Amino acid sequence: METDLSVIACIADIHIVSALDQCLSDLALPLVFVHHAKQISLIDKQRFLGLQPVTSLEENRALLYRVYVPTGYETGIMQRIIEATDLKMGGRGCIFSRTVHLLRGTPFSFDTDKLEKLCGKTDKHPPLDHSLISCTISRGVGEALAHAILELGVCVPVVFFGSGVGLRDKLGLLRITIPVEKEIIWFVVPRSDAELIERNLIPRARLDVPGQGFLYSTHVRAPVVNLRVRQGKRLHAATMEQVIAALDEVRGSSDWRRLGSRKNKSTSSISTINTRGVFFVGEEDEVERFRKLAMANGARGATLNALEMRSYNAADHHEHGMISHSRQLCDIITSPEIENKILQAIAQSDLFNSKSTCALQTFNVETPSVIRASAPVADNA
């Protein structure tokens, strides 16, 4: 089965997880992937004898939900999640969505009557006014990057962990120079600031040096972004993130608070290459088959993440009990030509049979040319 669906990503603080689970159960959504993450912010700590406070990083546990929904109900479902979790309160999390092309062996069973009643259907969607910047680096480097972006005040970074495969397998003894454990950091920023953020990240993480990491960006709809970059005592009737959210609503966008200037943008802009995201979710043996198939057809690197597959459909719960299974996500960033080769090879295999629950999603991403030009690989190793 091939179709276009929307993927809603919701990063939820651990304290609002129960409210989010109840909301997803009310909507009877059949396919949700969940994994652990953390949100990083700044906190000012008082020193002994009232000396000048010290600023340090504060980590808050969170869960990252990837929710598959029909595109027509995307806006209504996001709004219902926001209201159910009171997500607009600073520090609770963020939510965004994008449209993907999905390939799956078994069809989805959405309760469209319930979605129509609770969320409503619309063909009009908000603009893709934000960018998701995803940075894959060696474990231990993420704190410095998070601190740098927090100082700019554009968003609260989201961090989760994975492992790199592909490139290391081809290096022989040299593979010891590239750690297998990876940190994946997400920054959800206004599109007007995306280029400036990338300019900060690339030299700090040495992403223009082969083997140091990988970065890509994709445009998303983000009705709520976590702007509580600094924690501390509340000194006024409204917090700074509440003031910013109100001004965004009044002005109709976040462009008024862009960090960079529009002047001379053409001469200073980063050159990017249009690439494709190829994300496969399945059981461990299915992921290994897909990875080998992709590598055999030109993909040079991938990142693996452990996920939990959930169904919030009451019928599934009654038939199979609590539907919750361990899964793996294998994500590859590659050229459109390599993507076509991978899809042709999949079509000739039995990976997506009638009983298979694995899924493959593809979508457009942009990669800075300085990374691809300097790296010996075209993908995220």
Which residues does each PLM region occupy?
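Positively charged, small/polar-rich N-terminal and surface patches that mediate targeting and assembly
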Residues: M1-A381
